[in-house]
């Protein structure tokens, strides 16, 4: 669990270790369930050994069953199972999901204290005990920075909203101007956005991909309005202060600079990072061959189709662009893309 917390700490110094925050998040999604499974295995084997020694099931699994019941350990175990399950509940709103993750860190610290203090292999073998303490301190520091300190100490840039452009199909563009220093970023990265004046959500950070080129002064985020926070964005007025944290992510065209041929597939709002890459190709003199497939349900969902055709195809690089409406052409598969 400590490593899982380190993966999503949002510290620029740790991004290269995991290949960018986007890859770190995918790794985090593997580590989280793995930690829960290992916790269950640990408890099962421990319970079997205790049952053979004459301990009752109530003392092992029911808090406050008797004076000998390890109530605090039992409560922490159930809390970790509950929070671990809720973390993967897709029906939960983003705000509640975020709160669950914050609480998980506190429960982790309680479990970590149990692991270090409780008599057993860790306490008896000093090198293992030292390693566990290092992991716990690293995980605890990651949680503290991520939950408590990031809003103040994170890589924040102040922007003012210039305009909100409605693209249709519940998609908008937020175009903003820097207040003082401009954020430097690579095409394809993403940021966390906060609106300090949004009542009830002043402290919330939401991730969005950048769809503008780093050579432009304006910063553009392309957003699908599907949640409580995003549905309030179209009503923001010009001049509203926006806090932008970033940039994050390793999915950039610079990462694949040695490759002369690129195949890019963007589905729905997933076309966003490729818009920034295409915009950058206008000023990039390094020739490469690019195949871009814009996958949508039908043509009316392709809100960036005209922008791609009118603005990005006339570059130094050769861009072969294909709109792929699945309602007429079916799912986009590798064989179909290569033969079209």
Regions picked out by a protein language model, each given a short descriptive name:
Residues 106, 110-116, 123, 228-229, ...:
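Reductase modules of NAD(P)H-dependent flavoproteins
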Residues 261-265:
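Conserved beta-strand elements of the Class I
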């Amino acid at each position: 669990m400590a490593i899982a917390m380190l993966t999503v700490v949002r510290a620029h110094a740790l991004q290269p270790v995991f290949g960018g925050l986007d890859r770190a998040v995918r790794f985090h999604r593997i580590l989280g369930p793995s930690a829960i499974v290992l916790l269950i295995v640990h408890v099962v084997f421990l319970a079997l050994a205790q049952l053979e020694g004459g301990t009752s099931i109530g003392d092992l699994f029911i808090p406050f069953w008797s004076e000998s019941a390890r109530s605090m350990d039992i409560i922490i175990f159930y809390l970790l199972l509950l929070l671990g399950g809720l973390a993967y509940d897709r029906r939960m709103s983003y705000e509640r999901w975020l709160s669950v993750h914050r609480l998980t860190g506190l429960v982790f610290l309680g479990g970590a204290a149990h692991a270090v203090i409780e008599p057993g292999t860790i306490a008896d073998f000093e090198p293992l005990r030292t390693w566990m303490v290092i992991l716990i301190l690293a995980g605890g520091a990651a949680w503290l920075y991520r939950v408590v300190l990031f809003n103040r100490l994170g890589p924040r840039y102040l922007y003012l909203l210039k305009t909100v452009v409605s693209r249709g199909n519940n998609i908008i563009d937020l175009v903003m101007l820097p207040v003082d220093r401009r954020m430097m970023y690579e095409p394809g990265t993403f940021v966390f956005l906060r609106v300090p004046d949004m009542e009830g959500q002043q402290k919330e950070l939401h991730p969005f991909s950048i769809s503008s080129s780093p050579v432009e002064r304006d910063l553009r985020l392309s957003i699908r309005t599907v949640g409580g926070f995003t549905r309030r964005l179209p009503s923001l007025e010009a001049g509203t202060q926006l806090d932008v944290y970033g940039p994050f992510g390793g999915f950039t065209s610079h990462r694949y600079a040695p490759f002369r041929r690129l195949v890019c597939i963007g589905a729905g709002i997933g076309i966003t990072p490729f818009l920034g890459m295409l915009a950058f190709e206008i000023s990039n003199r390094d020739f490469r061959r690019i195949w871009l497939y814009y996958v949508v349900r039908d043509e009316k969902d392709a809100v960036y189709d005209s922008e791609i055709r009118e603005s990005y195809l006339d570059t130094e690089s050769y861009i072969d662009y294909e709109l792929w409406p699945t309602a007429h052409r079916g799912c986009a598969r590798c064989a179909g893309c290569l033969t079209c």
